[in-house]
């Protein structure tokens, strides 16, 4: 079974370089992803491949989870892949989140996918996540990518890239 699922997709009225400024700076993620409370980098240098940080997120019952994250792929204006471990994942488990951007005329198509293959979640839990996501968000129109689209198209300036 395929354990990667699309959780967000949007056509954003901006060039990929502007969209990338939002996606590539994790300290700005809480502005458009309500599940994220705080990002704490392990180093002051700007984000790049290998950049590591701690992420505090709230998933259910107002309980905060802390996880470690690292950028495993960082292709400017094209693709960002983040590996996250810890939190309420089983020990040794991790997920990959991918933000893929591509230019389409005068817009950017942004797609967010989550790969649960290495999460060490029980089979039925993974199945439930994939099933429910496909049932209620098969188009990818819901979620935090939609929030990012609204911020960009409303003219909110992106967070400053650190470093």
Identify what each model region corresponds to.
Residues 1-48, 163:
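Hydrophobic ligand-binding cavity/cleft-lining segments
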Residues 9-13, 40, 70, 100, ...:
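Generic structural detector for well-ordered beta-strands
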Residues 40-90, 109, 142-163:
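Glycine-rich portal/gate segments that line the openings of hydrophobic small-molecule binding cavities
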